[in-house]
């Protein structure tokens, strides 16, 4: 790995209870199985390490600022390997926006603020944050997330050139061509 141009490091979760399933909530955002240590050791050998993340939910990434790229692939299915290879070789533009917020720490998430919200009270979970769930909580509380809802690469590049308006003076409701 030290002499390689880059290292592709595949990390993530699995569909096991307590990791990434509908059976049980995660008690931690940390990647299991010492994956953070694997990133640290790999970066020590080759700092040009690209992380390919396979997970269905946000995870902690204490190394996020140390890697040149993170490719969030979620669970891409049977042809995921082909799709990831096409992205990495430049055959396809890696584009998309995050559908969730990645908190910096578990404590930043309102769902983990009390025993009423996690793990719940006698099989009942109380959403004390009311409408301020997900990205709304981070915005309202002015908490900077690791990656915000909507973070990601553009779907395309575009530019406007040689624009001209049909008039120099317009008011609200006017049609311009």
Predicted regions and their residues:
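Hydrophobic helix-and-loop "lid/oligomerization" segment in the mid-to-C-terminal part
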Residues: 1-66
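Secreted, periplasmic, or luminal enzymes acting at the cell surface/secretory milieu
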Residues: 54-177
């Amino acid at each position: 790995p030290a002499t390689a141009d880059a290292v592709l490091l595949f990390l993530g979760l699995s569909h096991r209870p307590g990791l990434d399933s509908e059976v049980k909530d995660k008690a931690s955002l940390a990647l299991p199985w010492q994956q953070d240590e694997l990133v640290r050791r790999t970066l020590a050998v080759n700092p040009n390490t690209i992380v390919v993340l396979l997970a269905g939910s946000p995870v902690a990434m204490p190394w996020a600022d140390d890697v040149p790229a993170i490719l969030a692939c979620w669970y891409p299915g049977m042809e995921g390997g082909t799709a990831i290879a096409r992205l990495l070789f430049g055959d396809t533009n890696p584009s998309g926006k995050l559908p969730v917020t990645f908190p910096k720490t578990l404590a930043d998430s309102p769902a983990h603020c009390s025993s009423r919200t996690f793990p719940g009270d006698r099989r009942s979970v109380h959403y004390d944050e009311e409408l301020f769930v997900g990205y709304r909580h981070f915005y309202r509380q002015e908490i900077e997330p690791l990656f915000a809802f909507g973070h990601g690469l553009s779907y395309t590049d575009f530019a406007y050139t040689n624009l001209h308006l049909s008039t120099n003076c317009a008011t609200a409701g006017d049609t311009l061509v």
